[in-house]
Amino acid sequence: MSHEAVWQHVLEHIRRSITEVEFHTWFERIRPLGIRDGVLELAVPTSFALDWIRRHYAGLIQEALGLLGAQAPRFELRVVPGVVVQEDIFQAAPAEAPRPKLNPKYTFENFVVGPNNSMAHAAAVAVAESPGRAYNPLFIYGGVGLGKTHLMHAVGHSVAKRFPHLRIEYVSTETFTNELINAIREDRMTEFRERYRSVDLLLVDDVQFIAGKERTQEEFFHTFNALYEAHKQIILSSDRPPKDILTLEARLRSRFEWGLITDIQPPDLETRIAILKMNAEQRGLRIPEDALEYIARQVTSNIRELEGALMRAIAFASLNGVELTRAVAAKALSDIFAPRELEADPLEIIRKVADHFGLKPEELTGSGRKKEVVLPRQLAMYLVRELTRASLPEIGQLFGGRDHTTVLYAIQKVQELAESDREVQGLLRTLREACT
């Protein structure tokens, strides 16, 4: 991780811990110079600023570095007169703007497509190519951090590039509600309606928060109608489908269901690894496959947390001057994932089982059907299923590309044996202890 990226993460932590006035006064003009021998070097504009920051914020900076994995968090301040802010440092934590903008990082080019999101991606691409005609509205739902906002912004970028004359508006439901309240209070409803009803593409994030807000629903209902009747594109995101949004007016629910409803599921292992690879490549880093797989196995449901875990591991390695290996990744994430929660390595399970029976791992994963291999292979499949988050198809791939039904049969067979055979019970107990 570059020193700029390390400082960016430090700033994000600091910003959450102090007031905006403090942040703008003391931190906006600090520039990271580099990392030398594990020490983050920072440039400040004056000796007064250096002294003030050292006396009042040193502990906070060290705390932020510690959260990134620095074993002995250290930084050094240096006066560099006329130091200027590098804007990219603050992109991840911008000051509040009067209008939200599309995130330049969220494009189709860096959206990793997998079985969990392929339909949503295809629909988003279709809408970007022909707004107002393909699917209107497009309703994307799924859990937090799975890529809904990424897809919405990607559509916005694509439409802006293809049709530069079109007006695009991205807004969260919370912002829409707050702006509506202010417009009512300040008697600016005509201006408010003009803004949202004159766009060609309206992107509304977290629309589930509109539920229960009568005036907001009323206004959004008329905004929706105006845009839809004018053949303008509407894209909505939510953490649940329309039918599950309680206290949502029936007339809005029915309109949300007029177009295409598509979901995004948590990514599978291969997709998670691909996401991590892309993130690493974008930073010009080459990270060993087993380190990426380790991280991918620890974070299974949330892409935002997955990327955060990667950044933590990269920062940990950078701050401690070591290469990012599987072992380093495990150490970097050890205080996030308690030891009992850390997932066993499937390949290590296979090796342990093979060793116990005096076999080679390739014999368990190969196609051989010798009697002395069958039970150990079934036990290994059972333990991989029990001790990891691997799905049946993923386990099948580990064992020579076997079908998931074969894996299921092996697991059920071991369960049956364990219920009636004390020797198998003891064997499982021994192997389980060896693998965890």
Swiss-Prot record:
<dbReference type="GO" id="GO:0005737">
    <property type="term" value="C:cytoplasm"/>
</dbReference>
<dbReference type="InterPro" id="IPR024633">
    <property type="entry name" value="DnaA_N_dom"/>
</dbReference>
<dbReference type="Pfam" id="PF11638">
    <property type="entry name" value="DnaA_N"/>
</dbReference>
<feature type="region of interest" description="Domain II">
    <location>
        <begin position="80"/>
        <end position="100"/>
    </location>
</feature>
<dbReference type="GO" id="GO:0008289">
    <property type="term" value="F:lipid binding"/>
</dbReference>
<feature type="binding site">
    <location>
        <position position="147"/>
    </location>
    <ligand>
        <name>ATP</name>
    </ligand>
</feature>
<dbReference type="InterPro" id="IPR018312">
    <property type="entry name" value="Chromosome_initiator_DnaA_CS"/>
</dbReference>
<dbReference type="GO" id="GO:0003688">
    <property type="term" value="F:DNA replication origin binding"/>
</dbReference>
<dbReference type="InterPro" id="IPR013317">
    <property type="entry name" value="DnaA_dom"/>
</dbReference>
<dbReference type="InterPro" id="IPR013159">
    <property type="entry name" value="DnaA_C"/>
</dbReference>
<dbReference type="InterPro" id="IPR010921">
    <property type="entry name" value="Trp_repressor/repl_initiator"/>
</dbReference>
<dbReference type="GO" id="GO:0005886">
    <property type="term" value="C:plasma membrane"/>
</dbReference>
<keyword id="KW-0235">DNA replication</keyword>
<keyword id="KW-0378">Hydrolase</keyword>
<dbReference type="GO" id="GO:0016887">
    <property type="term" value="F:ATP hydrolysis activity"/>
</dbReference>
<protein>
    <recommendedName>
        <fullName>Chromosomal replication initiator protein DnaA</fullName>
        <ecNumber>3.6.4.-</ecNumber>
    </recommendedName>
</protein>
<comment type="function">
    <text>The DnaA box consensus is 5'-TTATC[CA]A[CA]A-3' in this bacterium; oriC consists of 13 clustered DnaA boxes and a 40 base pair AT-rich region. ATP-DnaA binds cooperatively to multiple DnaA boxes, while ADP-DnaA binds with low cooperativity to the individual DnaA boxes. About 16-18 DnaA protein molecules bind their sites in oriC. Has a slow ATPase activity. Binds linear and supercoiled DNA.</text>
</comment>
<dbReference type="Pfam" id="PF00308">
    <property type="entry name" value="Bac_DnaA"/>
</dbReference>
<keyword id="KW-0963">Cytoplasm</keyword>
<dbReference type="InterPro" id="IPR027417">
    <property type="entry name" value="P-loop_NTPase"/>
</dbReference>
<feature type="binding site">
    <location>
        <position position="148"/>
    </location>
    <ligand>
        <name>ATP</name>
    </ligand>
</feature>
<dbReference type="GO" id="GO:0005524">
    <property type="term" value="F:ATP binding"/>
</dbReference>
<comment type="subunit">
    <text>Oligomerizes as a right-handed, spiral filament on DNA at oriC.</text>
</comment>
<dbReference type="InterPro" id="IPR001957">
    <property type="entry name" value="Chromosome_initiator_DnaA"/>
</dbReference>
<feature type="binding site">
    <location>
        <position position="149"/>
    </location>
    <ligand>
        <name>ATP</name>
    </ligand>
</feature>
<dbReference type="Pfam" id="PF08299">
    <property type="entry name" value="Bac_DnaA_C"/>
</dbReference>
<feature type="region of interest" description="Domain I, interacts with DnaA modulators">
    <location>
        <begin position="1"/>
        <end position="80"/>
    </location>
</feature>
<dbReference type="InterPro" id="IPR020591">
    <property type="entry name" value="Chromosome_initiator_DnaA-like"/>
</dbReference>
<feature type="binding site">
    <location>
        <position position="145"/>
    </location>
    <ligand>
        <name>ATP</name>
    </ligand>
</feature>
<keyword id="KW-0446">Lipid-binding</keyword>
<dbReference type="InterPro" id="IPR003593">
    <property type="entry name" value="AAA+_ATPase"/>
</dbReference>
<comment type="similarity">
    <text>Belongs to the DnaA family.</text>
</comment>
<dbReference type="InterPro" id="IPR038454">
    <property type="entry name" value="DnaA_N_sf"/>
</dbReference>
<keyword id="KW-0547">Nucleotide-binding</keyword>
<comment type="function">
    <text>Plays an essential role in the initiation and regulation of chromosomal replication. ATP-DnaA binds to the origin of replication (oriC) to initiate formation of the DNA replication initiation complex once per cell cycle. Binds the DnaA box (a 9 base pair repeat at the origin) and separates the double-stranded (ds)DNA. Forms a right-handed helical filament on oriC DNA; dsDNA binds to the exterior of the filament while single-stranded (ss)DNA is stabiized in the filament's interior.</text>
</comment>
<dbReference type="GO" id="GO:0006275">
    <property type="term" value="P:regulation of DNA replication"/>
</dbReference>
<keyword id="KW-0067">ATP-binding</keyword>
<keyword id="KW-0238">DNA-binding</keyword>
<dbReference type="GO" id="GO:0006270">
    <property type="term" value="P:DNA replication initiation"/>
</dbReference>
<feature type="region of interest" description="Domain III, AAA+ region">
    <location>
        <begin position="101"/>
        <end position="317"/>
    </location>
</feature>
<feature type="region of interest" description="Domain IV, binds dsDNA">
    <location>
        <begin position="318"/>
        <end position="436"/>
    </location>
</feature>
